[in-house]
C-alpha cells in the first residue's frame, strides 16, 4: 500500500519514478523545488537518464498538412483483428491507427464480433469475415481477408485474433502478400 498524495514536492529535478509505472497515480500534482540558485548551470553538463516530453515539444516533428490533402494520401490501414472473445482488441487497434494519422482505416473481423465493432466504431468500415464455432476467423477467412488486404497501404494483424486454425491461415496468407504487415 502507498499514500496517494494530492501534491508531491521533489527537489532539484523530477524523478523518473514520478512519471512512470504507478508513480503518476500516487504522486498527484508535482512541484519541483529548487535547492540551488544556479542549478541549471550545474546540471546542463550532466547526462540525464530521461527527459520529460510534453505535447508542445513534438510540434516541430510534424510538418503542416497541405490544404488539398485527402484521406487516401495519408495511407490506408486494414486492421485484421478481433474474435468473439476479444472484440475490444480490434476496436482499440482501429482507434489507434486513426489517431496516429492514417487517412483511411477499415477493420476485417470475424462475423461473430463484426456488429459489435461496427457499433463501437460507426465511422470505420467493418468487413464481416466468416468465423468458426468459437467466434474466431474460420477456414474460409484466408482468401477473403487476403483479397481485401491487397487494396490497402498496410495491414495491422493480430490483436485479439486467438490462435485458431483459421486465424493462423489468415496470418500465413497475409505474410505471402506484397503488403506491409
Spans of model-derived segments:
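Small-residue (G/A/S/T)-rich helix-start motifs and N-terminal tracts that mark the onset
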Residues: 5-7, 13-181
Amino acid at each position: 500500500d502507498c499514500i496517494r498524495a494530492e501534491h508531491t514536492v521533489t527537489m532539484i529535478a523530477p524523478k523518473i519514478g514520478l512519471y512512470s509505472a504507478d508513480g503518476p497515480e500516487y504522486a498527484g500534482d508535482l512541484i519541483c523545488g529548487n535547492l540551488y540558485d544556479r542549478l541549471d548551470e550545474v546540471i546542463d553538463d550532466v547526462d540525464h537518464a530521461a527527459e520529460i516530453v510534453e505535447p508542445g515539444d513534438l510540434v516541430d516533428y510534424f510538418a503542416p498538412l497541405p490544404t488539398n490533402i485527402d484521406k487516401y494520401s495519408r495511407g490506408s490501414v486494414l486492421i485484421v483483428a478481433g474474435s468473439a472473445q476479444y472484440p475490444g482488441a480490434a476496436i482499440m487497434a482501429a482507434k489507434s491507427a486513426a489517431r496516429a494519422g492514417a487517412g483511411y482505416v477499415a477493420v476485417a473481423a470475424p462475423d461473430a464480433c463484426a456488429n459489435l465493432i461496427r457499433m463501437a466504431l460507426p465511422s470505420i468500415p467493418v468487413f464481416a469475415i466468416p468465423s468458426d464455432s468459437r467466434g474466431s476467423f474460420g477456414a474460409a477467412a484466408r482468401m477473403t481477408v487476403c483479397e481485401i488486404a491487397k487494396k490497402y497501404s498496410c495491414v495491422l494483424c493480430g490483436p485479439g485474433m486467438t490462435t485458431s486454425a483459421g486465424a493462423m491461415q489468415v496470418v500465413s496468407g497475409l505474410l505471402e502478400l506484397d503488403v506491409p504487415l
